[in-house]
Amino acid sequence: MAKEQFQRNKPHVNVGTIGHVDHGKTSLTAAITSVLAKKGFAEARGYDQIDAAPEERERGITISTAHVEYETENRHYAHVDCPGHADYVKNMITGAAQMDGAILVVAASDGPMPQTREHILLARQVGVPAIVVYMNKCDLVDDPDLLELVEMEIRELLNEYEFPGDDTPIIKGSAVKALEGDAAAEDSIMELMAAVDSYIPQPERPVDQPFLMPVEDVFSISGRGTVATGRIERGVIKKMEEVEIIGIKDTQKTAVTDIEMFRKLLDEGQAGDNVGLLLRGLKKEDIERGQVIIKPGTVKPHKNFKAEVYVLTKEEGGRHTPFFNNYRPQFYFRTTDVTGCCTLPEGVEMVMPGDNVNLEVQLITPIAMEKAMRFAIREGGRTVGAGRISEILD
């Protein structure tokens, strides 16, 4: 059978289910596909198909994630569901599954539990823009006052982590009943999807953002000048536009005199393109891998930052022993390693493999960075951790 052409007639949004173990994240994922399948918007996926999530490797870390896709009248969704709690932590910090929004599942019979809190905190730290709540297992609760109480608890918890708890849509239902074909429960799934459609904002497309390209390689072409190659991360670059080259060395200004892709000349390059940029008046030694080329003034180089970090276990190929204050590994940003010194949070003596920790880092050379940017932590070329910048300090 020929591969189906991906139709880009609806805006695309990435979502994921989060919440405490056994509160019904996977059942809800199955219910969404089964209810939408009846409307011709999805392929029904059973609980077992989703629960047997394949393992993926992202930046040297193995993560189990299930991906399903479905559509509503308005949008096309890619949906991720992780079986294990550790998979969520790894997933959210490494950005293996970018979430434009999350569906928080809370069992009405239990109310918010420790991982409910932890997942909301993670969503806050990794910058998930919006959360919609599905209160599951409402069929197991007879007392309407109890449902109201659980709803209040959820709203308070969201407020505590700076999500707008009072305005967050909370839909009550039962994923299992919906899978069994119960009409009211199926309606709750449609209500949830309507909330996801309207409440989770449409992500800004990379081409609409200011131009940025990490430099992967540099060479000189005799008689023409210096070419920097890389994949455009965001934005658009046109011939003769001015750019800045930042990070590692002092910031330099130049202009792009030619853009080349697959040995052909282009008038413009855009997000996702692998291009070579011919840079006016630069020698090969003026620019190196690890720097980034940007629209002037849009990003600054920094040395000091705070980051949310996941430390790999021995089984994941990480360290076998803990590390202590002033630990000095390499931080891999986009295309290069830079040595940095780690300061542990107050009261934390050491960090064990498998831990999730907030570190302060001081790099030996400045690197182009922004809040929410992701990096790997390496020792001698092997990945020992993954992180995301939560705050820039200089």
From Swiss-Prot:
InterPro entries: EF-Tu_GTP-bd (IPR041709), EF-Tu_GTPase (IPR050055), EFTu-like_2 (IPR004161), EFTU_2 (IPR033720), G_TR_CS (IPR031157), P-loop_NTPase (IPR027417), Small_GTP-bd (IPR005225), T_Tr_GTP-bd_dom (IPR000795). Residues 174-176 are annotated as: G5. It comes from the Bacteria. PROSITE patterns: G_TR_1, G_TR_2. Residues 60-64 are annotated as: G2. The keyword Membrane does not apply. SUPFAM superfamilies: EF-Tu/eEF-1alpha/eIF2-gamma C-terminal domain, P-loop containing nucleoside triphosphate hydrolases, Translation proteins. Keywords: Cytoplasm, Elongation factor, GTP-binding, Hydrolase, Magnesium, Metal-binding, Nucleotide-binding, Protein biosynthesis. It catalyses: GTP + H2O = GDP + phosphate + H(+). GTP hydrolase that promotes the GTP-dependent binding of aminoacyl-tRNA to the A-site of ribosomes during protein biosynthesis. This is Elongation factor Tu. The lineage of its organism: Bacteria, Pseudomonadati, Verrucomicrobiota, Verrucomicrobiia, Verrucomicrobiales.
